[in-house]
């Protein structure tokens, strides 16, 4: 899958799950399961419930995603 094939959407972190997984509610109302990207993990950026984030979704599975950016409050 090429990097051009990803779908980027904004959402809000609803819940924190084990293994750096998060439940994210997207702008369209759907709730997905998302994990943290390597760059966010590498720079020790903390993601907490209530944070606004950008999520990359694969066109093949729209229920799982990768958190790529956390907006500053």
From Swiss-Prot:
Sequence ranges assigned to domain S1-like in this UniProt record: 1-72
Main location: cytoplasm
Gene Ontology, cellular component aspect: cytosol
Keywords of the record: Cytoplasm, Initiation factor, Protein biosynthesis, RNA-binding, rRNA-binding
InterPro entries found in the cross-reference section: NA-bd_OB-fold, RNA-binding_domain_S1_IF1, S1_domain, TIF_IF1
One Gene Ontology MF term: rRNA binding
Location of the protein in the cell: Cytoplasm
Pfam families (alphabetical): eIF-1a
Domain of life where this protein originates: Bacteria
The protein's role, per its UniProt record: One of the essential components for the initiation of protein synthesis. Stabilizes the binding of IF-2 and IF-3 on the 30S subunit to which N-formylmethionyl-tRNA(fMet) subsequently binds. Helps modulate mRNA selection, yielding the 30S pre-initiation complex (PIC). Upon addition of the 50S ribosomal subunit IF-1, IF-2 and IF-3 are released leaving the mature 70S translation initiation complex.
Subunit description: Component of the 30S ribosomal translation pre-initiation complex which assembles on the 30S ribosome in the order IF-2 and IF-3, IF-1 and N-formylmethionyl-tRNA(fMet); mRNA recruitment can occur at any time during PIC assembly.
Family that this chain belongs to: Belongs to the IF-1 family.
Descriptive protein name: Translation initiation factor IF-1
Organism: Lactobacillus delbrueckii subsp. bulgaricus (strain ATCC 11842 / DSM 20081 / BCRC 10696 / JCM 1002 / NBRC 13953 / NCIMB 11778 / NCTC 12712 / WDCM 00102 / Lb 14)
Gene that encodes it: infA
């Amino acid at each position: 899958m090429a990097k051009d094939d990803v779908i980027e959407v904004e959402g809000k972190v609803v819940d924190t799950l084990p293994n750096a997984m998060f439940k994210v509610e997207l702008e369209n109302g759907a709730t997905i399961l998302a994990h943290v990207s390597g760059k966010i993990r590498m720079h020790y950026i903390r993601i907490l419930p209530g944070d606004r984030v950008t999520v990359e979704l694969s066109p093949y599975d729209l229920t799982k995603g990768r958190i790529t950016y956390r907006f500053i409050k």
